[in-house]
Amino acid sequence: VAETLKLVGIDPEKYFSEYIETPVYVTEELTIGKGLGEEIFNSAKLEFSGIRDDQLERIMKVSDYNKIARMFGEQEINIDSNEYAIIGDYDAVVEIRNKSLSIGHEIVLDGKTYKPAYNECVYGFISDSTQHMETGIFIVPDSAVKEEWRKFNYLNANYIGETEEEKQIVEEKIVNLSDDETINASNVGDMMALSKLTNYEASKGIGSIVIFIGLYLGVIFLIS
């Protein structure tokens, strides 16, 4: 992600006081149906009619998630080698996931079984927002993840600028990333960039603003 930003003149070392890149993984071994268990999934369908049991869950290494947790000042995750946790902040979905966790529902990744480290979801998210939108990410031991499962890469960063004008320089570049001719010509793949400067300033003033940039797997491999 950082290398792609440099293509449009956004040098992370120059514009961000702090930034971290973290991958997110998916695999057919962990779908919503498998993550919740059959009984709880069937119950969830009554409330969320659009969900499918074959929808892929998102997975993160515990070391990667804890980098984000430290940046946002949230609780870090502690799990043993045979355990997993789920982070989230979207109450309606968290409530359903808690039912699964409370009964000790186990998941299987690459032939190894993992049990819940907590009996409920840990409050958390991987991209800051004024709305609670995180429906759940499985946090697993680093060794549980295979690199071929990598699907997205996130970059979370704090602007260096102290004034609204300084931050606006980076803001304008970030929100226009998907239309940038340099990126399109480089054929690095699909990119999504979000900035919450306006909403954040309206509610909390102009402190350090956290943004995230998500890139699909194809982008990561081409620029790594």
What positions do the PLM features span?
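Basic-flanked hydrophobic alpha-helices used for secretion and membrane insertion
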Residues: 3-220
